[in-house]
C-alpha cells in the first residue's frame, strides 16, 4: 500500500505520494482539485492510504471525497505528527515538507496499525459546527462582560448591555437547536456523572460518536488531557503542565465540571492524594478533567450509568 500525506489549508492542499517517483502535487481545496488528484492516481484506490491532520474543518470535504471514492483515510491528531517530526529532527517547515512528513508518518506508523476515517453523517457535522458556534458566542460573551466591568462611560455601558442581551439570546437559540439534534440515551447516561451538565454531556457524546476511540487514553489524548513533564537529571525539572494540543471545545467543556466537582468534594480520595504530593490546584483540576473524560468513555462504551461504588 502506498502512503499519501496531505497538508491542508483553506484554499490549497499539498499532496505527497510515496510511490517510486515520490510524486508531489498541489491542488485546490475544492472539487476541481479533488478530481485533478483522482486522475493522477490511476491505480486502484485500495492501493493508497491517505493521512492528514485534524485541523479546523478544512480537511472535511477532502476526507469525505476520498472515502466516497474508495480510498483509506486517517485523520491524525496533530500532536502525533508533531512528535513524529521531532523524532525525524525536522526543522524546515514548508507546506511541501509538511505533507512529506505526514506521508512518512503514515508509512511508518499507520500502515502497521491504523484507524481509518469514516465519513460523519450530516447531523454529526451539524452538531460539530453548532458546538463551535456556541463556543465562539460564549467567548464573545465573556469578552463583553469583562469590557462591561471596566467600562467608565455610561453610554458605552448601556450599548454593551444591549449586545450582551442579544448574545445570550443567540446562545439560547443555538443550544435549543443543539438539544434537538442530540437527544439520546447515551447523553442521559453521561449526565449521571457528578457535575456533568446537559451541555457537557452533549459535547462528550458528540465526540465519542463521531470518532472511533479504541481506548480511554486515546480519548483523553484527543482532548489534550495528557499531562506533560520535562525532567532530565538535575538540569531540567519543569512543572507538569497541560498539553497545549487537543480539541479546544472538548477541553473547555470539561473545565467547569471539573471545578464544580472539586468544590463538591467529588473524587476526594484522588484530590487528597494529589494535594498531599504538593500538586497545585491547576494540576488537580486537570486530573479531575481527565477522570471525567475517562468515566464518560467507559459509560458510553459499556452502556452503563455512573455508580460511585464502581467508579469512585
List each model region and its residues.
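Short active-site oxyanion
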Residues: 1-3, 47-50
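Gly/Thr-rich phosphate-binding beta-strand-loop-beta motif of the actin/hexokinase/Hsp70
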Residues: 1-18, 102
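Short, glycine/acidic-enriched loop or turn micro-motifs at the edges of active sites
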Residues: 10, 56, 80
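Acidic, metal-coordinating catalytic cores used for nucleic-acid/nucleotide bond scission
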Residues: 51-61
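Phosphate-backbone recognition surface of nucleic-acid-processing proteins
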Residues: 198, 204-277, 281
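Low-complexity, acidic/Ser/Thr- and charged residue-rich accessory regions of DNA metabolism proteins
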Residues: 234-235, 271-312
Amino acid at each position: 500500500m502506498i502512503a499519501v500525506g496531505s497538508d491542508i489549508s483553506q484554499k490549497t492542499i499539498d499532496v505527497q505520494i510515496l510511490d517510486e517517483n515520490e510524486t508531489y502535487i498541489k491542488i485546490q481545496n475544492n472539487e476541481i482539485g479533488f478530481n485533478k488528484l483522482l486522475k493522477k492516481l490511476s491505480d486502484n484506490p485500495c492501493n493508497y492510504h491517505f493521512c492528514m491532520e485534524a485541523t479546523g474543518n478544512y480537511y472535511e470535504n477532502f476526507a469525505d471525497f476520498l472515502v466516497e471514492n474508495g480510498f483509506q483515510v486517517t485523520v491524525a491528531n496533530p500532536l502525533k505528527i508533531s512528535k513524529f517530526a521531532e523524532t525525524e529532527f525536522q526543522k524546515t517547515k514548508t507546506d511541501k515538507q509538511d505533507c512529506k512528513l505526514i506521508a512518512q508518518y503514515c508509512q511508518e506508523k499507520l500502515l502497521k496499525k491504523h484507524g481509518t476515517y469514516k465519513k460523519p453523517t450530516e447531523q454529526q457535522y451539524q452538531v460539530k459546527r453548532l458546538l463551535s458556534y456556541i463556543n465562539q458566542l460564549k467567548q464573545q460573551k465573556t469578552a463583553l462582560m469583562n469590557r462591561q466591568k471596566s467600562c467608565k462611560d455610561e453610554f458605552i455601558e448601556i450599548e454593551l448591555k444591549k449586545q450582551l442581551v442579544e448574545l445570550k439570546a443567540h446562545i439560547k437559540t443555538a443550544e435549543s437547536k443543539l438539544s434537538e439534534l442530540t437527544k439520546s440515551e447515551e447523553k442521559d447516561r453521561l449526565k449521571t456523572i457528578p457535575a456533568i451538565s446537559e451541555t457537557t454531556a452533549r459535547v462528550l457524546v458528540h465526540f465519542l460518536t463521531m470518532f472511533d476511540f479504541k481506548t480511554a487514553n486515546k480519548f483523553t489524548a484527543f482532548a489534550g488531557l495528557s499531562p506533560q513533564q520535562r525532567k532530565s537529571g538535575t538540569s531540567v525539572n519543569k512543572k507538569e503542565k497541560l498539553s497545549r494540543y487537543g480539541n479546544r471545545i472538548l477541553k473547555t467543556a470539561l473545565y467547569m465540571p471539573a471545578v464544580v466537582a472539586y468544590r463538591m468534594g467529588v473524587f476526594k480520595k484522588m484530590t487528597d492524594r494529589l494535594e498531599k504530593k504538593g500538586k497545585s490546584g491547576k494540576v488537580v483540576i486537570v486530573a479531575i478533567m481527565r477522570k471525567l473524560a475517562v468515566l464518560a468513555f467507559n459509560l458510553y462504551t459499556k452502556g452503563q450509568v455512573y455508580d460511585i461504588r464502581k467508579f469512585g
